[in-house]
Amino acid sequence: MFGMRLLPFLANAVILFNFAIGDNDAASLSGTWSSKSNQVFTGPGFYDPVDELLIEPALPGISYSFTEDGYFEEAQYRVVANPRNIGCPQAVLIYQHGKYEILTNGTLILTPFEVDGRQLLSDPCNDDGVSTYSRYNQSETFLSFDISIDDYHGIYKLQLNQFDGSPLQPLYLAYRPPMMLPTITLNPTATNDPTDAVGKGSVSKRSLRQIVKRNLENKHKQLATKKYSGILVSPYLWYVCTGVIGVGSALFLFS
């Protein structure tokens, strides 16, 4: 009988837990998210804006970072197999950052800084061993996104749904606060007015070098982790709910 009376409490506890982690807003979106390979991360380890270098990770994957005040960063390393010649895969590295907006209907829009996006395309069987390095600018629209606790890994999971509703591969929370390059225009284009090139929202090469150098020096000091502001957003609530369910089930079976 005690087990039967406990079941409504257990159900409410699980509902409360799911409600606590189900808010799809800028606060819950903030952080660095990485795909299953766990090898691709945004930040200075992927792109060096001073020397214009895209750094190839150990494995393909994608990563997105978001701040609470509306900035994003994107890192992609994709490899496409060549079915006609397995020794000729194509690979592409893509870096973008800029601003994002969450609409009232839950749509997520990413608008990159046009001059900062970079792409490195490698086609070893057709480019004579010389990869193509170019600017890249592609706005992105995600119809919706969902943040939850992954049932298998027990960590936060971000599911982005593309403009047509098809799901992107799931991303998992790697850092919070996010690991990102400065949220300003890193490589402003030259203008006739020298003050415009180092104006508001941009930095000079010298100051940019100092910023990136500091980020690199602090790379292994800023392994940010989730900060919990209360019991309702704590992962311990998951274990408490699981334990209570287990106890309730045992009492129900033996009552």
Curated annotation (Swiss-Prot):
Function (record text): Required for normal levels of the cell wall 1,6-beta-glucan. Involved in a protein folding machinery chaperoning proteins acting in various physiological processes including cell wall synthesis and lysis of autophagic bodies.
Transmembrane segments: 231-251
Entry GO terms, CC: endoplasmic reticulum membrane
One annotated GO molecular function: unfolded protein binding
PANTHER family: PROTEIN ROT1
Principal localisation: endoplasmic reticulum
Name of the coding gene: ROT1
UniProt KW ATP-binding keyword: no
Source superkingdom: Eukaryota
Gene Ontology process terms (BP): 'de novo' protein folding; budding cell apical bud growth; establishment or maintenance of actin cytoskeleton polarity; fungal-type cell wall biogenesis; protein folding in endoplasmic reticulum; protein N-linked glycosylation; protein O-linked mannosylation
First and last residue of the signal peptide: 1-22
Official protein name in the record: Protein ROT1
Localization of this protein: Endoplasmic reticulum membrane
Glycan-carrying positions: 105, 137
Recorded topology in the membrane: Single-pass type I membrane protein
Family according to the record: Belongs to the ROT1 family.
InterPro entries: Rot1
Cytoplasmic side: 252-255
UniProt keyword list: Endoplasmic reticulum, Glycoprotein, Membrane, Signal, Transmembrane, Transmembrane helix
Lumenal side: 23-230
